[in-house]
Amino acid sequence: MNVVILGTGCANLNSVKSAIARHGYEPKVSRDPDVVLLADKLFLPGVGTAQAAMDQVRERELFDLIKACTQPVLGICLGMQLLGRRSEESNGVDLLGIIDEDVPKMTDFGLPLPHMGWNRVYPQAGNRLFQGIEDGAYFYFVHSYAMPVNPWTIAQCNYGEPFTAAVQKDNFYGVQFHPERSGAAGAKLLKNFLEM
């Protein structure tokens, strides 16, 4: 199977690459349209700011390429947020617009931001991405912005208030947490995605 990690220039790819390799795959990192469009599975990881990430997406001519993908795509952390419409970060950043939902800064409710560490995730029953993962399993988060619960939410988490922990629209999936840092539950989620 052809597994590709999109080379956005805004992610630490080694941990994602290693996590995929542990399942027996050899992922390629690429932004070449011929490689990306022929991939069986695509990963869109991201760390840092939405502005820097979108600058890289545009500079590397990935904007239209990502939106043209028809195979399963998994956005991780900031990569999930990039699927949204607009981030409140940096006075507003236009995102890919695949999911018609904004990404506001989380309300702190007296809790520290960023939301960092292990938290429980509650998936919708029957979603293939979470098959075999128990309701309330712990995943590892590091973020200050989060997509609200919306019609494309497939899993929720609570940090002062509920937010979207995972999302799906058509072939595009996103997880706000880091599956590559989330132990057995994260490994199972990656396996589910790779075997879809």
Swiss-Prot record:
KW Lyase (keyword) present: yes
Name the GO terms of the biological process aspect. L-histidine biosynthetic process
EC number from the UniProt entry: 4.3.2.10, 3.5.1.2
- Domain Glutamine amidotransferase type-1, residue spans: 2-196
Give the UniProt keywords, A-Z.
Amino-acid biosynthesis, Cytoplasm, Glutamine amidotransferase, Histidine biosynthesis, Hydrolase, Lyase
Give, as in the UniProt entry, the pathway in which the protein acts: Amino-acid biosynthesis; L-histidine biosynthesis; L-histidine from 5-phospho-alpha-D-ribose 1-diphosphate: step 5/9
Protein's cellular compartments = Cytoplasm
Keyword tRNA-binding among UniProt keywords: no
Which InterPro entries does this entry report, sorted A to Z?
Class_I_gatase-like (IPR029062), GATASE (IPR017926), Imidazole-glycPsynth_HisH (IPR010139)
Which GO MF terms does the UniProt record name?
glutaminase activity; imidazoleglycerol-phosphate synthase activity; lyase activity
Q: Which reaction does it catalyse?
A: 5-[(5-phospho-1-deoxy-D-ribulos-1-ylimino)methylamino]-1-(5-phospho-beta-D-ribosyl)imidazole-4-carboxamide + L-glutamine = D-erythro-1-(imidazol-4-yl)glycerol 3-phosphate + 5-amino-1-(5-phospho-beta-D-ribosyl)imidazole-4-carboxamide + L-glutamate + H(+); L-glutamine + H2O = L-glutamate + NH4(+)
Regions crossing the membrane: none
A cellular component annotation (GO) from this entry:
cytoplasm
Please explain the role this protein plays, according to its UniProt record: IGPS catalyzes the conversion of PRFAR and glutamine to IGP, AICAR and glutamate. The HisH subunit catalyzes the hydrolysis of glutamine to glutamate and ammonia as part of the synthesis of IGP and AICAR. The resulting ammonia molecule is channeled to the active site of HisF.
What this protein is called in its record is: Imidazole glycerol phosphate synthase subunit HisH
Query: Species name for this entry?
Result: Escherichia coli O157:H7
Primary gene name: hisH
